[in-house]
Amino acid sequence: LHVGTFEKRKDLLTLVKAFKLFKDNTKSNLKLVLAGSKNFNGDKQVYREIKRYISKNNLIPFIIIPGYINKKQAIYYFNNAFTYVFPSIDEGFGIPLIEAMRARIPVICSDIEIFKEIGYNSVIYFKKQDYNDLYNQLKLICKDKTIVERLVSKGIKRADLFNQKNFIKGFEKLY
């Protein structure tokens, strides 16, 4: 699962390429959901490039692109996801990372600084823009249930640090 706009900085093509390797080399029946707007802040060229890649590589039956989703739909996708992947090469904060940890699903994200700060040791990192490394991390999560359990456990605790109460406490300490 990935939830976010179709923008170049989100690097969704790396995710789609990694997913292709995953489908080509495993017998998994998992599908990839790329949910998010292609219009609001979205880059239509990025969207078209991803759609072309999906079509050219016969991935249409395996990749779902529902477009913009509302809160109820987002909850559904998070509650039914096997993992959340955040391949961004640049990100301001990354709220879906926290949402995924709260939804008790393991997270795989690029090794950019903001994700290291938010995710710390509760997510799996891959080298940004490296679809082979992302593919290897996808395989790892599928093979090792103890890693999934560890990530979920740590993720729940980590996400709790980013609740409103803790934010207000931190803000009050500044002033």
Q: What do these predicted ranges mean?
A:
Residues 1-175:
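Carbohydrate transferase catalytic cores enriched for Leloir-type hexosyltransferases
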